[in-house]
Curated annotation (Swiss-Prot):
SUPFAM superfamilies: L30e-like. InterPro entries: Ribosomal_eL30-like, Ribosomal_eL30-like_sf, Ribosomal_eL30_CS, Ribosomal_eL8/eL30/eS12/Gad45. The gene is RPL30B. One of its GO terms (molecular function) is mRNA binding. It comes from the Eukaryota. It comes from Arabidopsis thaliana (Mouse-ear cress). This is Large ribosomal subunit protein eL30y. NCBIfam families: PRK01018.1. Belongs to the eukaryotic ribosomal protein eL30 family.
Length: 112
């Protein structure tokens, strides 16, 4: 029960930092634009939802490894990630290009 509280609190922390990135930073949403930002080495952090297809996930992780960018597996499905971004559509993956006023890159180093 204690671990459930901790994960919920960290989940809320990620959501609030993500909302701040959406307001003050630069980001790209979607698979193709995430790969473009990784190939151009513009992305600083990649977030992937839990129900992103395995082939896409492994390809994003591979490009992120080549670009030395952190990858965070978001603890929710693509509907949850879209809602956390303040969008009314599903988001399977997103790349943070410029965090703006948020400290999301320091707080989430990535799962590498």
């Amino acid at each position: 029960m204690v671990t459930e509280k901790k994960t919920k609190k960290s989940h809320e922390g990620i959501n609030s930092r993500l909302a701040l990135v959406m307001k003050s930073g630069k980001y790209t949403l979607g698979y193709k634009s995430v790969l473009k930002s990784l190939r151009g080495s513009k992305g600083k952090l990649i977030l992937i939802s839990t129900n992103c297809p395995p082939l896409r996930r492994s390809e994003i992780e591979y490009y992120a490894m080549l670009a030395k960018v952190g990858v965070h597996h978001y603890n929710g499905n693509n509907v949850d990630l879209g809602t956390a971004c303040g969008k009314y559509f599903r988001v399977s993956c997103l790349s943070i290009v410029d965090p703006g006023d948020s400290d999301i890159i320091k707080s989430i180093p990535g799962d590498q």
